[in-house]
Amino acid sequence: MFFSFVELCFSQDINPREFDYRKADSIALHLPKSKKYSVDDLTILLTKNLNSDIEKYRVIFRWITDNIAYSFSNKTGDVEKVLQKRVAVCMGYAALYQAMCRKAGLECETVQGFAKIATDDIGTKLTKTNHSWNVITISGKSFLVDATWAAGNYNGKFVKDYDESYYLTEPRYLILSHLPEDSKYQFLDTLISTETFIKYPIVYSGLMKNKMNLKFIPEGKLKKELKVQFSTSETISNMYGMFDGDKISTPLEFTSDKNGYQVALKFPFMSKGGYTFFVNGKAVFGFKK
């Protein structure tokens, strides 16, 4: 009873997005990689020296993102098979995270929905769900996580590159790239429709890394003029743009005032392809011409 009371007070007094996860991360990243584990054994090993739920959620997430590679060679949601092969697609990542969380006594659900990853997806009608991610509960509050996108990048070959942006992602950010099939998982006061979602540009994690608060969401299909306006607590030193096929990016002129930053671009001549918008060297939006 005493432990439960301490745990409750501990959880309510912290912001999970600002918590120091170094202990949990160290456990996850230093467990021997060559050894084969069952879901039960691995979960116990990872969580046995952690007292708080917030750290248990994290240690499982970091182990999965550090040890499971994205590969179409294993499309199953069989979690034991994912563990043995160490490869999966989104279904396997989400299923494994859910199974391990539940083994540790943590609340976790898998969310099915639609993800936009390429500029060709802009404006394309959604017919069949193509992505899976998770929702977890900390101190009675729901948080969104995507182990697949956090693990790295895939462009014909998986490149391991952990991205913190997809752990406890704010709903206002995740909805720009992830549309849940069940709207209750949007966790927004105003729900986003399918018609609105498909018009969004492709959104990269630079949006979250730069802590950008958008004045409005630009359309994903480029017209002759593009405007982006946002505020942020970060210092913005540069903005760039690059068309598909360009070898180098083009510096963009922007202005700033007490309300934030603004950039206005004109495209008098456009051919088919894509355009990527960068802020502080990080990709933020992908547009379709």
Predicted regions and their residues:
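Bacterial Sec-dependent N-terminal signal peptides
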Residues: M1-D13
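Sterically constrained small-residue positions within well-ordered secondary structures
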Residues: F2, A99, K125-L126, I136, ...
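Generic recognition of cysteine residues
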Residues: C9, C90, C101, C108, ...
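Short charge-dense sequence patches
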Residues: F10-P16, I44-I54, T127, L176, ...
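Secondary-structure boundary elements
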Residues: D13-V89, A95-A104
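Short capping loops/turns at secondary-structure boundaries
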Residues: V87-C90, K125-T127
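Hydrophobic/aromatic-rich core segments of domains that either
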Residues: A95-L174
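Alpha-helical and coiled-coil interaction segments, frequently adjacent to or embedded
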Residues: T127, N155-K289
